[in-house]
C-alpha cells in the first residue's frame, strides 16, 4: 500500500470510529422513526442529488435491506444524464416538487434527505415538502461543511427531525498532496453509506424481534426468489422502481 492510500484508509477508519460513538444517540432516533414507519405500513423514501443520490440506490432493493425503502430517482438530479446540468438543476427553487409529487409521500412516512453541503435548493425543498406532507425527516449531512458555506442560507440541518452528521470536512476531500494545493480522497459517500446501513440494520433487528421483517435476500442465495417476489408484490404499489 502506498503512503497516500494508507492515509486515506486511516482517515476513513478514524472518522468511522468517531462516528460510532458520537452518533449513537442520533442513529437510534433515526431507527426509531423508520421502525415506527414500518410498523404502520408506511414507507421510507431516500432523496439525494448528485453523488448523494447513490445513497438512495444503495438502500433500494438491497441484499439485507428493508423492502419499505423507496428511492427517489430522476435523471435531472443524478449524474448520468449530465453532471454539469444536474449541479445547476439542484440549485433551482421549485425544481424538485414535481419529482417528489410522483411518489405519494404522506403522513407517517420518513424522508431521508441526503446532502453533504446541506444548503442547495433541492434538499431544502425536499425537506420542506416532507414537512408539508407530515413525513419525518432524517438528514445525513456534514455539519462542518454546511456551517462553513451557509452564509445566511437555510440549512438542511435546521429542518430535520434527526441530523446524522457524517463528519466530512468542507470540500469533502481529505488528502493533501505534496507540492500541490489540491486535495483528493472524498469521504462523504463512504461515511454516509456506513451510517445509513447501520441505522437500517438496527431497524431490521427490531422488526425481526417483532416477527415481521421485510428484508430482501441476495438474488443468488437459495430461496431468495420466493421471498423477494413476495416482498415486491407487497410493496410495489408505492415504489415505482420495483
From Swiss-Prot:
Residue ranges occupied by any SIS domain in the UniProt entry: 30-214
Matches recorded under Gene3D superfamilies: Glucose-6-phosphate isomerase like protein, domain 1
InterPro entries given in the database record: RpiR-like_SIS (IPR035472), SIS_dom (IPR001347), SIS_dom_sf (IPR046348), SIS_GmhA/DiaA_subfam (IPR050099), UPF0309 (IPR022951)
Record GO biological process: carbohydrate derivative metabolic process
GO terms, molecular function: carbohydrate derivative binding
UniProt-listed Pfam families: SIS_2 (PF13580)
Family: Belongs to the UPF0309 family.
Protein name: UPF0309 protein BSUIS_B0903
Native source organism of the sequence: Brucella suis (strain ATCC 23445 / NCTC 10510)
Amino acid at each position: 500500500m502506498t503512503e497516500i492510500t494508507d492515509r486515506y484508509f486511516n482517515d476513513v477508519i478514524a472518522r468511522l470510529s468517531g462516528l460510532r460513538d458520537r452518533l449513537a444517540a442520533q442513529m437510534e432516533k433515526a431507527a426509531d422513526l423508520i421502525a415506527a414507519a414500518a410498523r404502520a405500513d408506511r414507507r421510507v423514501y431516500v432523496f439525494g442529488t448528485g453523488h448523494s443520490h447513490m445513497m438512495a440506490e444503495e438502500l433500494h432493493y438491497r441484499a439485507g435491506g428493508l423492502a419499505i425503502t423507496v428511492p427517489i430517482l430522476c435523471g435531472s438530479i443524478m449524474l448520468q444524464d449530465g453532471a454539469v446540468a444536474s449541479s445547476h438543476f439542484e440549485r433551482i427553487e421549485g425544481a424538485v416538487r414535481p419529482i417528489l409529487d410522483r411518489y405519494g409521500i404522506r403522513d407517517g412516512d420518513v424522508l431521508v434527505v441526503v446532502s453533504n453541503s446541506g444548503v442547495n435548493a433541492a434538499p431544502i425543498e425536499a425537506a420542506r415538502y416532507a414537512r408539508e406532507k407530515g413525513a419525518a425527516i432524517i438528514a445525513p449531512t456534514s455539519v462542518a461543511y454546511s456551517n462553513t458555506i451557509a452564509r445566511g442560507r437555510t440549512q438542511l440541518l435546521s429542518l430535520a427531525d434527526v441530523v446524522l452528521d457524517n463528519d466530512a470536512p468542507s470540500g469533502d476531500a481529505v488528502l493533501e498532496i505534496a507540492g500541490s494545493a489540491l486535495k483528493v480522497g472524498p469521504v462523504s459517500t463512504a461515511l454516509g453509506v456506513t451510517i445509513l446501513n447501520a441505522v437500517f440494520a438496527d431497524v431490521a433487528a427490531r422488526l425481526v424481534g417483532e416477527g415481521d421483517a421485510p428484508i430482501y435476500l441476495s438474488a443468488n442465495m437459495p430461496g431468495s426468489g420466493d421471498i423477494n417476489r413476495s416482498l415486491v408484490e407487497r410493496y410495489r404499489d408505492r415504489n415505482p422502481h420495483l
